[in-house]
């Protein structure tokens, strides 16, 4: 779809998603990765485990950052059988699969950077500018390289 088409028109777009829309950049990259310089998935509800080897290889062509805060085990989701820890674990597995395929994928688990106290709504938390800075730094370091390799700035 529409997201892949928009990214293609915009050229070298970084797609950022949150929560339930977390897999939208991944789906767009599978349709047409040409316009996507990078993907940032903020607390995605899932990183699908059902991707085939060919799909993982396709996704490995687009740098990806997945971000989770520190509330993984203690926040009720209201969804039977779902936990943020399960989503985190699934995304960690996804990242390893992408790396194994030669891709650039990374987990930014905020407590590992000594950043604590975040909710699921990272962009609304008191330290949102610090988190935005980390995202921008990742984009500059990772997505920017892809952009330069295609001869655009």
Regions found by a protein language model. Name each.
Residues 1-14:
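Conserved acidic catalytic loop of the alpha/beta-hydrolase fold
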Residues 8, 17, 57-60:
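Extracellular/periplasmic catalytic domains that process cell-envelope and extracellular macromolecules
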Residues 15-16, 39:
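Conserved alpha/beta-hydrolase fold motif
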Residues 16-25:
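Gly/Ala-rich beta-loop-alpha elbow adjacent to hydrolase catalytic centers
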Residues 27-31:
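Active-site signature of alpha/beta-hydrolase-fold catalytic machinery across serine-
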Residues 34-48:
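A conserved short beta-strand
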Residues 44-110:
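The feature captures the conserved acid-bearing segment of alpha/beta-hydrolase catalytic domains
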Residues 115-117, 121-153:
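Catalytic active-site module of serine/aspartate enzymes centered on a nucleophile-bearing elbow/loop
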């Amino acid at each position: 779809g529409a997201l892949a088409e928009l990214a293609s028109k915009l050229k070298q777009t970084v797609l950022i998603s949150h929560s339930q829309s977390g897999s939208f950049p991944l789906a767009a990259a599978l349709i047409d990765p040409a316009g996507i310089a990078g993907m940032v998935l903020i607390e995605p509800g899932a990183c699908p485990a059902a991707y085939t080897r060919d799909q993982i290889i396709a996704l490995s062509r687009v740098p990806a950052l997945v971000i989770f805060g520190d509330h993984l085990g203690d926040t009720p989701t209201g969804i039977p059988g779902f936990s943020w820890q399960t989503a985190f674990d699934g995304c960690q597995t996804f990242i390893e699969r992408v790396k194994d395929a030669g891709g650039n994928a990374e987990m930014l688990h905020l407590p590992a950077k000594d950043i604590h106290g975040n909710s699921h709504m990272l962009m609304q938390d008191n330290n949102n500018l610090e988190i935005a800075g980390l995202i921008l730094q990742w984009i500059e370091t990772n997505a920017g390289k892809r952009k330069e390799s295609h001869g655009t700035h």
